[in-house]
């Protein structure tokens, strides 16, 4: 039943987003690299990419499955290098959804990406891990408390000159906080279930609106600079107080 509801909602949201905010392209505003969530691939992100292209962003959607965070980070490295080569001098924004936000942050932190990426926008990101990853065959390293997650979150979560943004719904299962400087956009209104919110984020007009703000360096929420080590995995989970709801 839930799968059918999500598919129906996805189709409706795609239809809405497909007509939202798309007109004549504006002058070149930089490069956007979109990194999908687990299992999704590129297709659900194409309407979002089309909307950004119409607003003047040279947008690339990566076709990654999110099964291996470090491997995906190396793919992101290659994609960003290619985008910079194709658009010399243009700022690069890296936008990751769900586990795609983790592979994007691994790239920024471990592969030198923070030296070349101007802004990082995480959508529905389990930055300190997700219980849903525990015991699954795909990217089990995203389970809270694994050595991988401990290493990813050791020291400064927001290194370099990159600016860091977080987008999530009111009932997201993980609040997406990072220590160091981060803009936390005001959580958008829930559809009624955090899991549904999370799955549909790539095609929700509310997410597009907040992404526009982030790409324009407008912190439509709260800028927070938490000290290193102030965040624990448990403190990031179920900020609405409704587990898995």
Can you describe what each PLM-predicted range is?
Residues 1-25:
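Secretory targeting and sorting signals
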Residues 27-36, 43, 51-64, 70-157:
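Serine-dependent carboxylesterase/thioesterase catalytic core
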Residues 37-38, 169:
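Structural motif
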Residues 109-245:
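Helical cap/lid subdomain of alpha/beta-hydrolase-fold lipid enzymes
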């Amino acid at each position: 039943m839930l799968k059918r509801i999500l598919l129906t909602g996805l189709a409706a949201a795609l239809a809405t987003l497909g007509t939202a905010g798309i007109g004549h392209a504006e002058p070149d505003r930089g490069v956007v690299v979109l990194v999908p969530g687990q299992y999704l691939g590129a297709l659900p992100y194409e309407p979002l990419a089309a909307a950004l292209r119409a607003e003047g962003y040279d947008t690339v959607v990566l076709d990654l499955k999110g099964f291996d965070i470090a491997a995906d980070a190396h793919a992101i490295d290659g994609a960003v290098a290619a985008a910079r080569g194709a658009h010399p001098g243009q700022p690069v924004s890296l936008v990751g959804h769900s586990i795609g936000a983790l592979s994007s942050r691994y790239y920024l932190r471990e592969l030198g990406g923070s030296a070349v990426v101007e802004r990082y926008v995480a959508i529905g990101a389990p930055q300190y891990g997700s219980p849903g990853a525990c015991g699954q065959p795909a990217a089990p390293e995203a389970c809270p408390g694994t050595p991988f997650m401990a290493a990813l979150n050791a020291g400064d979560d927001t290194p370099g000159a990159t600016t860091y943004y977080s987008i999530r719904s009111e009932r997201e299962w993980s609040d997406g906080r990072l220590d160091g400087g981060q803009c936390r956009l005001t959580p958008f209104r829930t559809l009624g279930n955090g899991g549904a919110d999370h799955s549909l984020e790539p095609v929700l007009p509310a997410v597009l609106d907040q992404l526009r703000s982030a790409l324009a360096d407008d912190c439509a929420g709260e800028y927070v600079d938490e000290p290193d080590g102030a965040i624990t995995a448990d403190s990031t989970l179920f900020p609405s107080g409704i587990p898995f709801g």
